[in-house]
Amino acid sequence: MAIEREASGRCFESPAAGRWGAITMDKIAVLTSGGDAPGMNAAIRAVVRTAGFYQLDVIGVMRGFHGLIHNEFIELNPRSVADVIHRGGTILKSARSAEFPTPEGQAQSVANLREAGVRGLVIIGGDGSFRGGMRLQSAGISIIGVPATIDNDIPCTDYSIGFDTTVNTVVEAINKIRDTATSHERIYVVEVMGRHSGHIALYAGLAGGAETVLVPEVEADLDELCRRIVSGYKLGKAHSIVVVAEGVGGDFKTGRHLDESSAFQIGDY
């Protein structure tokens, strides 16, 4: 996107940007949506400071799309974000909105932004947040999406905001669990976030030295897993750590009987 500055100091998108043409704006908004991710506050700070460089005013939208509908706007400036870079969570809060997916909710959101003089919105969040942004973009609001999700499941993004911290936190937990697993010669299963994405399990499992990693993207065979664990113990292995993404478990290929709760009975403990 080609960015230039008018004589008045306001930032605008030059005609070189393509089919959108020249867009003049002097105020933008920023919101965080979805689950909070470590680094969101640093991203908010970066947006505010960069906007200040281009002499743009910044409005913070509290509680994501819920706040967009209910006009929960606050003014942001470099001073208001001076001490947030190392804080977890998000200073703009985050909340679910049952109203935004409706045409009425989206129309109200656009109306509130236009009434506030906002032409551009920066959305810091994950895939669901970006889908919401696409709806606003189709209504004429310029959108920039900043990938911020611990699942790291945004296409064409190497590392989303929050993913690295999450992996390091899981590795730290695995390192602590391993000592107990070795002492008692037991199997420990570590479940991590990732309903449809196995990035956390894969990276943390590799970095933490887990014996087995199960991810939603790869079909797992529970019987084969058990055979590998038993084989390891016969060879003298003192413990086994299995890292499992939360989305794994619905399609196990197994001949074992499942009880009424659908819980897998790996063996007597």
Range-by-range predicted roles:
Residues 25-69:
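N-terminal phosphate-binding or glycine-rich loops at protein starts, especially the Walker A/P-loop
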Residues 27-34, 90-95, 119-123, 188-191, ...:
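Short glycine-rich or small-residue beta-strand-to-loop segments that form or flank ligand, phosphate
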Residues 33-36, 56, 61-67, 96-97, ...:
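Short, ordered loop/turn segments at secondary-structure junctions
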Residues 68-123, 128-129, 161-173:
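Glycine-rich oxoanion-binding loops at beta->alpha junctions
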Residues 112, 123-125, 131, 135, ...:
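Accessory alpha-helical/coil subdomains and C-terminal extensions
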